[in-house]
Amino acid sequence: MGNYELAIGYSLIFWPRFIVIDDYVLRAGSTVEALRNFEEATGGDRRATEAVMNHIHIADIHTSGAEPSEAQVRYLGRLMKETLTAKLKAEFPDRSFVVRFTDEPGLDITDYELTFWQQV
């Protein structure tokens, strides 16, 4: 079985926390400095800035042990997309978001990513 520390860790993956900086909705832990760097890198494109700052690689959830299979990563990615969509809707009912999971078969295992950005 697991333990309480693992349960709390998984809760933060499947039901993440957010912060708002300059009207960007970002995963908790994001900084103003990182935001400014990504704004510069994206030429001020708000959608691209949010998308890159909010993306996660599903295969990076666990960094030790056996590499996950494509089926495992795609299953978790789909589930995380559903929970992320629900969390954003619950926490920001007045905003619209695009939540995207790269769910194509045959990708490199590290290319399965989940991200979100505000739809304007």
What are these regions (language model features)?
Residues 65-120:
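Acidic, proline/glycine-rich low-complexity IDRs
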Residues 1-70:
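An N-terminal amphipathic alpha-helical segment
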